Amino acid sequence: MGRTLDYEFSYGEEITITPRNYEFDFRHAGKINTHYALIGMAFVSEGYPLYYDAVNEKGLGMAGLNFVGNAAYEDVLPEGETDRDQVAQFEFIPWILTQCASVKEAREKLSKLRLTGTAFSKQLPTSQLHWMIADKDACIVVESMKDGLHVYD
């Protein structure tokens, strides 16, 4: 998987490496201290890598692509009201790539996921995206829409 991230202008994105075991403190899904390393294109804001796309050390890659007018995300539920992992859409790429070595493992995580519309900040609102996740054996597309989370081969 690869792409050139061709835009007419730059958002300040840069090649970004997240080393193994860099602490991710996800907004709703807690902290992860032990995980795979990542490399990809990201805009780094307040020390946090907002990945456009990335690949982990196991060869699992993920890209967030425009899905304007179609993407819809879940509202955050109070703790204890859901048994699913609640992940903000801007954290989706590192949440998958830090924990999964394959598309098969990603599918398992997706079966327990609530993708939320939590914005990174007032200056960086929620993006309308869908995602491609691929390894050497498989590729899926993940879309969060009004009628739920969809996974396509």
What are the residue ranges of the model-derived segments?
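Hydrophobic transmembrane signal anchors and adjacent membrane-proximal interface regions, especially
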Residues: 71, 94-95, 149
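Surface-exposed patches in mature extracellular/periplasmic domains of secreted proteins
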Residues: 107, 118-128
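Short, solvent-exposed loop/turn segments at the edges of secondary structure
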Residues: 55-57, 88, 126
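Alpha/propeptide regions of enzymes that mature by internal proteolysis
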Residues: 82-116
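Extended amphipathic alpha-helical segments with heptad-repeat/coiled-coil character used for oligomerization
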Residues: 124-153
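An acidic- and aromatic-residue-enriched active-site/binding cleft used to recognize and process polar
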Residues: 4-6, 67, 111, 136, ...
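A contiguous strand-loop segment
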Residues: 1-81, 117
